[in-house]
Amino acid sequence: MAPAWSLLLALLLLSCNAICSLGCHLPHSHSLAKRRVLTLLRQLRRVSPSSCLQDRNDFAFPQEALGGSQLQKAQAISVLHEVTQHTFQLSSTEGSAAVWDESLLDKLRTALDQQLTDLQACLRQEEGLPGAPLLKEDSSLAVRKYFHRLTLYLQEKRHSPCAWEVVRAQVMRAFSSSTNLQERFRRKD
């Protein structure tokens, strides 16, 4: 009987390693929600990107904040939280509801809200570890400034459909990069 329990325990530990990320225990639903968010962001597209070429802009995407090799786990979780929170805020504006399908936005906000809950719990867990490094605000600040530039751009373009398409593409890029960051830390664990 003991070998059977040992095998079950080993399988449980292996499966936990496969679904946990960043050293904290995010539920399997978190990775499913991340994929769901990217799918929903794709589905929100209402305008052909080629018709909005004149609206493209360089928002100085903070690639280093999302892909830096010096980022510690707690810092990475903080950056992931920032990206998710700002994506949630953008999807909750009146302008987004005017341009995008409300039922898709509701689904997107639900998925983002679940991720925020998971990340907040994970951040508390990582910050509570003895010897955890103090968070450097540089990466989180870079993400906040990036999303601020997106918000200013929307205001400047008067929340036009093309402006929202450009922002949607930028948010997808940020979210994809945050997913890649999460995967990188999961592989290290």
Swiss-Prot record:
Subcellular localization, as worded in the UniProt entry: Secreted
Xref: Pfam families: Interferon (PF00143)
GO molecular function: cytokine activity; type I interferon receptor binding
Protein's UniProt keywords contain Disulfide bond: yes
UniProt keyword annotations, A-Z: Antiviral defense, Cytokine, Disulfide bond, Secreted, Signal
Gene Ontology CC annotations of this record: extracellular space
Residues spanning the signal sequence: 1-23
InterPro entries found in the cross-reference section: 4_helix_cytokine-like_core (IPR009079), Interferon_alpha/beta/delta (IPR000471)
Cystine pairs: 24-122, 52-162
Main localization, broad class: secreted
Gene Ontology terms: biological process: adaptive immune response; B cell activation involved in immune response; defense response to virus; humoral immune response; natural killer cell activation involved in immune response; positive regulation of biosynthetic process; response to exogenous dsRNA; T cell activation involved in immune response
Function: Produced by macrophages, IFN-alpha have antiviral activities. Interferon stimulates the production of two enzymes: a protein kinase and an oligoadenylate synthetase.
Family recorded in the similarity comment: Belongs to the alpha/beta interferon family.
Protein name (database record): Interferon alpha-D
Lineage: Eukaryota, Metazoa, Chordata, Craniata, Vertebrata
